Amino acid sequence: MRDSLLVFCGAGLGGLLRHGLNQVSLRLALFGFPWMTCFINISGSLAMGLLVGYLAGHGDSRFPQSLRLFLATGVLGGYTTFSTFSLENALLIERGAVGLAVLYSLVSVGLGLGGLFLGLTLTRSLS
């Protein structure tokens, strides 16, 4: 239960950070490109890489599981799930499963877009 509460609180903070950045981006819209979403995805991936890289070098003793859950699953998960997607792809590539990483990327993006358009189509047809 404690771990779930830590993830919940972290996700709230990550979501608030994302929302704040999106509010700033409303004033910085250039050429109709989603710059802030792009920045959030890249910065979240960078933060995940820094966190995982640090953990790999320092182990459990200096970084308890509860703090990992709060930061990685909670804060970064609330900020952007793209950081987890990037980490999972990097782990596949590091294990030599490049083909599986490409497949995961294509399936995730392709079916994600497909699911979104299906949802839009269904709700529009019901309106």
From Swiss-Prot:
Disulfide linkages recorded for this protein, renumbered to the chain, are none
Q: Name the reaction it catalyses.
A: fluoride(in) = fluoride(out)
| Protein name per the record | Fluoride-specific ion channel FluC
Family annotation (PANTHER family): FLUORIDE EXPORT PROTEIN 1-RELATED
Write out the GO biological process terms.
cellular detoxification of fluoride
Q: Which family does it belong to?
A: Belongs to the fluoride channel Fluc/FEX (TC 1.A.43) family.
Q: Which Pfam families match?
A: CRCB
GO cellular component terms attached to this protein's record: plasma membrane
Per UniProt, activity regulation is:
Na(+) is not transported, but it plays an essential structural role and its presence is essential for fluoride channel function.
Q: What is its main location?
A: membrane
Q: What does this protein do?
A: Fluoride-specific ion channel. Important for reducing fluoride concentration in the cell, thus reducing its toxicity.
The UniProt keyword set, sorted, is: Cell inner membrane, Cell membrane, Ion channel, Ion transport, Membrane, Metal-binding, Sodium, Transmembrane, Transmembrane helix, Transport
Membrane topology per the entry is: Multi-pass membrane protein
> What HAMAP family does the record tag this protein with?
FluC
**Subcellular location as annotated:** Cell inner membrane
